[in-house]
Amino acid sequence: MTRVFIANAKTEERSALRLMLLNLDLEVVGDASDWETTLVKAPATNFNLLLVDWDLLPANAVTSLSAMRQACSNAIIVVLTSYLDAHQQAAQSAGADAFISKGEIPNRLADHLLAISRNLNSYETTRSKNESESIPRSIL
């Protein structure tokens, strides 16, 4: 099962994402409203999918996402952004695996998240016994 951690400063957006994820039968294992809390709480939840709002990241997004990648190398990081074109290259450089525009209609957002979840679950079901093996970014 896909275990999702939500990192978003806005309570209403976290709540909406939580509801959508639960409706998609994805497990929400935690959330945080700031990056410092995310770095502390998220690794302890054993999440395998992090949804993070670009605006939540500190000024140096590359360093911030790199720290999360080091703590949780087997997780997929999906950046949610209001400005997909403007932030996509920066997010990719920072270590994000996927990008989703906050402007997407709910059904399209749900489709993106389900596709990521299916690919992640398929990989976890078939991966070798080497538990330390990182998730290939090509599954997205």
List the predicted regions and their residue ranges.
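Acidic, metal-coordinating helix/loop segments flanking the phosphotransfer/catalytic sites
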Residues: D31-L49
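C-terminal output helix
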Residues: A86, E104-L114
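CheY-like receiver
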Residues: L120-L140
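Alpha4 helix (beta4-alpha4-beta5 surface) of REC/receiver domains from two-component response regulators
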Residues: Y83-I100
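Conserved phosphotransfer cores of two-component systems
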Residues: P43-T45, M68-N74, A94
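A short, hydrophobic beta-strand element within the central beta-sheet of small alpha/beta folds
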Residues: N74-A86
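Two-component/phosphorelay signaling modules centered on CheY-like receiver
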Residues: T11-G30
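Conserved phosphotransfer microenvironments
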Residues: L51-M68, L84
